[in-house]
């Protein structure tokens, strides 16, 4: 392959397959600085067989405003290809897969994806790319390019040209691992497996950028590349398909691209130095390839995708005595599209370090593709645990902290009233029991709901991140108090707080945890008293419902079960069990979702539909919890795999009345119901008796009745909400959440 002078890219690979043209620029308008990443991709085509599919994507970063946004435009061929891949996928959790197929079957695309109004055109020699009049890329006849994007909310018109002798394009063929979406499709935004790449030198850009309602006349520099070949659907052989890449232009004229395959996803944020390959270009065009190390730093978890990305990296290239730290302008520069719903980081970044012992600075792009296929929805949701723990640590720090303790005690307006000794006592009594209980965080799905409800309405949840702590602390406080009232010695496999700290301390600390929301609202909604009032009203209703549910729990359902067994009428018993489940589980989940909707500015009809849906989700979750109890309840373990959280039929063994047992009253012969109930009623049945009772509940259809009820609850309430909210990846995941609540096991 011979590189041609000028900016225009090389011809396509005759092998066919994905073909991608990609640009990245740093642009300035006076003191304002922007980053632009733009890609035009063709997936398949005549050379590779099958119908052509096209996608045009761009993302803009506004450095001073710390805002990132963009658009993705696809043709019907791309939609059809994605639908086929999703339908054939057997790796992604079926609940997520069905939710995406449901969206696509309605002719809807999750934002930021949009359907091109007209067919795309891709012509070579001379280059002429047209994405339905939305995106145009053409040669200008003088070795440069004209690129234009006319989106609904953003766009640009730029002339790109070589900067002169120092900017001669130079070619090298690189190999990058495949980047695939959740359905297995190659991402047009990422290096393609075994894809030859023409890497152009720096390009100059001049033109107009439209973003967030304003236009800027910009100039700047950047680069383009063209990658082609590889497989759209790579083999799933268990290999880590993630990758990271830093591309930097230094102020001494050198350019650097360092690439690492694998190890890009680290949910715990632990940095590790990994082997990488660096390709450098000297100011006079000499190309140097050398071994390097790359260490990810400053982890940030996206509340949209729950990916954890390093937002900075340290690069070392010993051969050239180069040490460089590259840091993103700001963390939230994540890109998501229908061809890569797992998400990826495309962060414009600054770099500084030394080369040959001399200081150097630069700017460029830091990219991370974590390849997080959602193979297990529950494990995916559980990724929010790390964020939840961080936010809890801010409210309940491990060591006594005057500011947090005065807030906790309600004396922030007069902090001098609490001296050192008092602060020590407050920390031991109020913080200790809560941190003890949260050390074994569960699924944290309530925290997930609190953020997902905001995203559902197209609002960025990042400014409201502290709400995840309030959601979890509400649950934690109730667990601490419930364990005292139920005389439970264990919680999440650890001694309960009252066993360690005493009942009086535990009850007080658990109750105090309910007020975490007050502290959080003062931070995230400091200037909106009316909105805070509505949030408080919802939250106080949640607290009332929780105490009502615990009252029913303490009273128990034994007498109601006795009566149902004698009369053969299960309806009153079922209503009673459902009431307890609604008050203790559904009402809090509904309230947390409603708080998210209020924060997002949802309309009244949206607010009502969301409340009904989360009523159903919470009740379905507790019904499926009762079903899971019969089979042994597990949860994703932090170190991988799953760990048991309940023994098989633990509730049945304790003589508790659950939904399967209540449904069995109408499904088993009266004599068998009586035998089963009185065998477990007093909580002293042996293992064989409990196992036989659990088997009877499965065989008589009681479990099927529960799963059917849970499924119907969710399906009946999801469609009205779905039709009222924007079609986004948050809405796809919200549909999957309902399916998960109704059926917790992965099929």
Protein language model annotation of sequence segments:
Residues 1-184, 189, 193-375:
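Structured soluble/peripheral alpha/beta segments that form catalytic or ligand/cofactor-binding pockets
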Residues 111, 503-516, 520-521:
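Aromatic-rich carbohydrate-recognition surfaces in CAZymes
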Residues 195-201, 212, 236-240, 505, ...:
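Short, contiguous, pocket-lining structural segments
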Residues 327-393, 703-747:
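Short hairpin/turn module used for nucleic-acid contact or packing/dimerization
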Residues 375-474, 480, 484-499, 554-571, ...:
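Conserved N-terminal diphosphate/IPP-binding helix and adjacent helical/loop segment
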Residues 419-470, 516, 521, 574-617, ...:
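Alpha-helical phosphate/pyrophosphate-handling elements in metalloenzyme active cores
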Residues 455, 480-500, 513, 518, ...:
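Acidic, Mg2+-coordinating active-site segments of isoprenoid diphosphate-utilizing enzymes
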Residues 521-540, 676-677:
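Transmembrane helix-loop-helix
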């Amino acid at each position: 392959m011979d590189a041609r002078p000028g900016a225009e890219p090389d011809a396509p690979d005759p092998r066919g397959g994905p073909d991608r043209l990609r640009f990245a620029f740093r642009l300035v308008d006076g003191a304002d600085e922007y980053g632009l990443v733009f890609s035009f991709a063709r997936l398949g085509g005549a050379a590779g067989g099958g119908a052509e599919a096209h996608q045009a994507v761009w993302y803009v970063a506004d450095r001073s405003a710390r805002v990132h946004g963009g658009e993705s435009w696809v043709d019907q061929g791309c939609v059809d290809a994605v639908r086929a891949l999703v339908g054939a996928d057997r790796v992604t959790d079926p609940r997520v897969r069905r939710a995406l197929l449901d969206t696509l079957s309605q002719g809807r695309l999750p934002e930021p994806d949009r359907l091109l109004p007209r067919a795309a055109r891709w012509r070579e020699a001379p280059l002429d790319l047209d994405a339905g009049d939305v995106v145009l890329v053409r040669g200008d006849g003088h070795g440069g390019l004209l690129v234009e994007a006319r989106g609904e909310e953003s766009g640009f018109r730029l002339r790109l040209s070589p900067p002169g002798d120092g900017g001669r394009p130079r070619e090298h063929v690189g190999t990058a691992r495949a980047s695939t979406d959740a359905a297995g499709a190659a991402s047009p935004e990422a290096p393609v497996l075994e894809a030859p790449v023409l890497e152009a030198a720096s390009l100059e850009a001049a033109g107009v950028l439209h973003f967030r309602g304003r236009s800027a006349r910009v100039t700047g520099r950047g680069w383009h590349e063209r990658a082609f070949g590889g497989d759209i659907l790579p083999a799933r052989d268990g290999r880590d398909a993630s990758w990271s890449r830093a591309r930097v232009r230094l102020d001494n004229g050198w350019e650097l691209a360092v690439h690492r395959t694998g190890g890009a996803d680290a949910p715990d944020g632990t940095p590790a130095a990994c082997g990488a390959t660096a390709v450098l270009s000297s100011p006079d065009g000499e190309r140097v390839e050398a071994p390097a190390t790359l260490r990810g730093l400053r982890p940030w978890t996206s509340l949209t995708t729950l990916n954890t990305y390093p937002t900075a990296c340290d690069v070392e290239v010993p051969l050239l005595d180069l040490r460089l730290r590259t840091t993103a302008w700001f963390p939230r520069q994540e890109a998501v599209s229908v061809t890569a719903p797992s998400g990826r980081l495309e962060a414009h970044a600054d770099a500084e370090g030394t080369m040959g012992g001399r200081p150097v600075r630069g700017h460029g792009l830091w990219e991370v593709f974590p390849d997080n296929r959602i193979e297990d929805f529950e494990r995916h949701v559980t990724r929010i645990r790390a964020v939840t723990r961080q936010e809890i640590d801010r409210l309940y720090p491990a060591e006594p902290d005057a500011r947090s303790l005065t807030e906790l005690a309600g004396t922030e307006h007069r902090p001098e009233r609490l001296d050192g000794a008092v602060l020590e006592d407050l920390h031991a009594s109020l913080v200790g029991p809560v941190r003890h209980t949260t050390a074994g965080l569960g699924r944290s799905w309530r925290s997930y709901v609190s953020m997902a409800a905001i995203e559902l309405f197209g609002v960025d949840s990042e400014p409201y991140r502290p709400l995840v702590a309030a959601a979890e602390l509400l649950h934690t406080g109730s667990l601490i108090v419930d364990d005292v009232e139920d005389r439970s010695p264990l919680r999440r496999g650890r001694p309960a707080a009252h066993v360690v700290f005493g009942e009086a301390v535990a009850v007080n600390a658990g109750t105090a945890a309910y007020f975490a929301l007050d502290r959080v609202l003062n931070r995230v909604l400091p200037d909106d008293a009316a909105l805070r009032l509505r949030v408080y009203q919802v939250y106080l209703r949640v607290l009332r419902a929780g105490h009502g549910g615990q009252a029913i729990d303490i009273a128990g359902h034994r007498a109601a079960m006795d009566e149902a067994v004698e009369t053969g009428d299960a309806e009153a018993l079922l209503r009673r069990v459902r009431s307890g489940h609604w008050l203790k589980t559904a009402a809090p989940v509904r309230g947390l979702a409603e708080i998210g909707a209020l924060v997002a500015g949802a309309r009244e009809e949206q607010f009502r539909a969301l409340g009904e849906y989360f009523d159903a989700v919470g009740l379905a979750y507790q019904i499926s919890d009762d079903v899971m109890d019969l089979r042994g309840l597990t949860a994703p373990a932090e170190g991988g795999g799953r760990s048991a959280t309940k023994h098989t039929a633990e509730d049945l063994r304790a003589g508790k009345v659950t939904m399967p047992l209540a449904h069995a009253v109408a499904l088993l012969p009266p004599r068998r119901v009586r035998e089963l109930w009185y065998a477990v009623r007093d909580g002293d049945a042996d293992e064989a008796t409990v196992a036989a009772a659990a088997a009877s509940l499965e065989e008589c259809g009681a479990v099927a009745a529960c799963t059917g009820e849970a499924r119907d609850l969710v399906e009946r309430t999801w469609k009205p909400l779905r039709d009222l909210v924007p079609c986004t990846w948050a809405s796809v995941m919200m549909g999957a959440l309902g399916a998960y609540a109704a059926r917790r096991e992965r099929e």
